[in-house]
Curated annotation (Swiss-Prot):
Sequence ranges assigned to domain WAP in this UniProt record: 26-73
Region annotation (Interaction with LTF) ranges: 117-133
Induction: Androgen dependent. Down-regulated in Sertoli cell-selective androgen receptor knockout mice.
Function: Serine protease inhibitor that plays an essential role in male reproduction and fertility. Modulates the hydrolysis of SEMG1 by KLK3/PSA (a serine protease), provides antimicrobial protection for spermatozoa in the ejaculate coagulum, and binds SEMG1 thereby inhibiting sperm motility.
Tissue-wise expression: Expressed in differentiated spermatogonia in testis. Expressed in spermatogonia cell lines GC-1 spg and GC-2spd(ts) as well as in the Leydig tumor cell line MLTC-1 (at protein level). Expressed specifically in epididymis and testis. Expressed predominantly on the postacrosomal region of mouse spermatozoa, in Sertoli cells, Leydig cells, and round spermatids in the testis, and in the principal cells of the cauda epididymidis epithelium.
Record-level GO cellular component terms: acrosomal vesicle; cell surface; cytoplasm; extracellular space; protein-containing complex
Disulfide bonds: 33-61, 40-65, 48-60, 54-69, 77-127, 86-110, 102-123
Gene responsible for this protein: Eppin
Species this protein is from: Mus musculus (Mouse)
Domain BPTI/Kunitz inhibitor: 77-127
Pfam families the record matches: Kunitz_BPTI, WAP
Protein name: Eppin
Length: 134
């Protein structure tokens, strides 16, 4: 196939993605789960086993020492600190985007969001390196 034919197909896909909305674009160019090395203090309970266990735009990803539903388009490190609704007492780390550092907080054990890491090093691996690139 000539280069002009290839470029024409790419332009067509781009136009279709705008007309059909994000679902066609997601099928053609699927998003991936975040990848980084993590040294877990303990394995967390899996909250999903496959993508269809998750809400529509989320994928079942190995993340932060367990499987969790994540939206690959969402910047986890920009989420606010969220202790959750339960009354347990877990020392965790969250990434504070305002000062680009990982900070300790107390997690209640349920709900909350994915800006919630077992250790400072996992938080730094997931967020600080990415923050320094932007």
């Amino acid at each position: 196939m000539k280069l002009s034919g290839f470029v024409s197909i790419l332009v067509l896909f781009g136009l279709l993605a705008r007309v059909q909305g994000p679902s066609l674009a997601d099928l053609l160019f699927p998003r991936r789960c975040p990848r980084f090395r993590e040294e877990c203090e303990h394995q967390e309970r899996d909250l999903c086993t496959r993508d269809r266990d998750c809400p529509k735009k989320e994928k079942c990803c190995v993340f932060n020492c367990g499987k969790k539903c994540l939206n690959p388009q969402q910047d986890i490190c920009s989420l606010p600190k969220d202790s959750g609704y339960c009354m347990a007492y877990f020392r965790r780390w969250w990434f504070n985007k305002e000062n680009s550092t990982c900070q300790v907080f107390i997690y209640g054990g349920c709900q909350g969001n994915n800006n919630n890491f077992q250790s400072q090093s996992i938080c730094q691996n997931a967020c600080e390196k990415k923050s320094s690139l932007t």
